[in-house]
Amino acid sequence: MRILLSIILLLSGLFQAEAAYKPHKREFRGAWIQCVNGQFQGMSPTDMQKTLTRQLDILQQYGTNAIIFQVRAECDALYKSDIEPWSKYLTGRQGQAPTPYWDPLQWMVEQCHKRGMEIHAWINPYRAKTKGTTELAANHIARTHRERCFEYDGLYVLNP
């Protein structure tokens, strides 16, 4: 009798677990495209767009449906901002707008949406300067509000 009761309890638990599970309509299959690895430095806007187009095409072929695009690495921006300077990872010099002008984030939004992909902007919220950055733009927070940063071993970090 105990064995029969145990089997009934076990089977009822399995059926309840199966009934509670509802598969998701869609999975998040994302890829991160970063700017800090130097892959864009020295590129013209046209070359950067070609590189990004190739990356998006390959990722789409592999079933990626979301892109996480790094747009703020060191309190600088890969998009038009009234607050943050242009990123050195875009032009090679922080604070310098791309020539010819283009907005990488806006361009990525358009390209991802053409492919039916989501796009998410990735920011580094506290990193203000790495050791590799030697010049800061005049409107960089470490120059305009130095009191909001602390320095450690050549790095600047925003003080939350």
Describe these PLM feature segments.
Residues F69-Q94:
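Glycine-rich, proline-tolerant flexible connector loops at the mouths of alpha/beta enzymes
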Residues Q106-V109, H113:
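Anion (oxyanion) recognition and catalysis
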Residues M1-I7:
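Sec-dependent signal peptide recognition
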Residues I8-A17:
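Hydrophobic h-region of N-terminal signal peptides that target proteins for export
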Residues R26-F28, W32-Q34, G38-K50, E110, ...:
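Active-site-adjacent "subsite" loops/lids of carbohydrate-active enzymes
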Residues K50-A77:
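Catalytic domains of carbohydrate-active enzymes, especially glycoside hydrolases
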Residues G30, L59, I67, C112, ...:
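Conserved, mostly hydrophobic/aromatic
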Residues K22-E27, Q60-Q61, H113-K114:
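Extracellular/periplasmic catalytic domains that process cell-envelope and extracellular macromolecules
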